[in-house]
């Protein structure tokens, strides 16, 4: 197998291995250190499932969380998840609680996409049912989705703002998002400056980080720019752009120093899968970047194997005459 372009941008997106599902996660006070890594967040979220009985529920008996953390859903990512569950079954249960206001119904804490897949496949969904108060609900939801869902900055900021509007203090919001007080303050400030409709039109912007959103919020927040913002986001061509390009289009339209935005051509992804289908890989290649992502049962071990053999693989790459000329 050719080894060139095999290594850069490695991401392991395997679904969490099945766990026999956890007593309610012990809440930590403000004096305790804040969770700072995604690995730790992942372990925190899994504790909500450990030691509990996994049951099968009719997806039609499930209602969504009372606070949203996503701005739409990637149809491609959803279809990948749907195909994986159709082929292998649901590896990880979702977490639900008895609905606080509707008898014989449940409210999803986390696992909305898995529940949607089960509904579309006409299957029951594996779930852990746990009695949680609203506070524990939002912490569990925020921790699990921060660890698993690759939420963008603006999605996390929206989640933080929604929680504050529901009356939760910033200590709770920080616990849910594994963010310190300064980070939470910036998130909510961005949401306060940019109208909700404008954020909805721009979308989740997975490639846009905090500082650029802060810069945009300062531009949008200027009274002199109000008419210009409305004109840009209501232009029919605005909706034809990708979500990241919509951000760039608005930013450059408000910032005279910014470079004009060009509509980017989507990268074409290529797929690879062994005969036994124990791992699935997607990779894209451009002039300056190569990205590889893997999922399924052996994605983690195989990714670790590649990472552990980078020196050898790169040496073989150079031996095959791929050394860049000076």
From Swiss-Prot:
Pfam families: ParBc, RepB. Keywords: DNA replication, Plasmid. SUPFAM superfamilies: KorB DNA-binding domain-like, ParB/Sulfiredoxin. GO terms for biological process: chromosome segregation; DNA replication. The keyword Ribonucleoprotein does not apply. The keyword Nucleotide-binding does not apply. One of its GO terms (cellular component) is chromosome. SMART domains: ParB. One of its GO terms (molecular function) is DNA binding. Disulfide bonds: none annotated. Belongs to the ParB family. This is Putative replication protein B. It comes from Sinorhizobium fredii (strain NBRC 101917 / NGR234).
């Amino acid at each position: 197998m050719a080894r060139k372009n095999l290594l850069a941008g490695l991401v392991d997106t395997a679904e969490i291995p099945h766990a026999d599902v956890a007593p309610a996660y012990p809440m930590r006070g403000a004096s305790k250190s804040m969770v700072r890594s995604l690995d730790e967040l992942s372990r925190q979220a899994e504790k909500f499932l450990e030691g509990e009985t996994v049951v099968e529920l009719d997806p039609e008996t499930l209602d969504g969380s009372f606070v949203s953390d996503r701005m739409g859903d990637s149809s491609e990512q959803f279809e990948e998840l749907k195909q994986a569950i159709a082929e292998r079954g649901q590896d990880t249960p979702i977490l639900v609680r008895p609905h606080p206001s509707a008898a014989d119904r449940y409210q999803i804490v986390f696992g909305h996409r898995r529940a949607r897949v089960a509904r579309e496949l006409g299957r029951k969904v594996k779930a852990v049912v746990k009695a949680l108060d609203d506070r524990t609900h939002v912490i569990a939801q925020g921790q699990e989705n921060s660890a698993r869902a690759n939420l963008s900055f603006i999605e996390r900021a929206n989640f933080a703002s929604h929680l504050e509007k529901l009356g939760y203090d910033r200590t709770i919001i920080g616990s849910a998002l594994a963010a310190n007080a300064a980070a939470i303050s910036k998130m909510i400030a961005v949401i306060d400056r940019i109208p909700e409709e404008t954020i909805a039109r721009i979308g989740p912007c997975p490639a846009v980080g905090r500082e650029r959103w802060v810069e945009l919020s300062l531009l949008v927040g200027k009274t002199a720019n109000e008419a210009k913002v409305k004109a840009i986001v209501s232009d029919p061509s605005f909706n034809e752009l990708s979500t990241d390009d919509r951000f760039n289009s608005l930013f450059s339209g408000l910032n005279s120093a910014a470079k004009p935005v060009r509509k980017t051509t989507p990268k074409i992804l290529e797929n690879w899968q062994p005969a036994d289908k124990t791992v699935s890989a997607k990779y894209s290649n451009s002039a300056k970047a190569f990205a590889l992502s893997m999922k399924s049962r052996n994605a983690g071990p195989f990714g670790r194997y590649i990472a552990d053999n980078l020196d050898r693989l790169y040496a073989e790459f150079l031996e095959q005459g791929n050394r860049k000329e000076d």
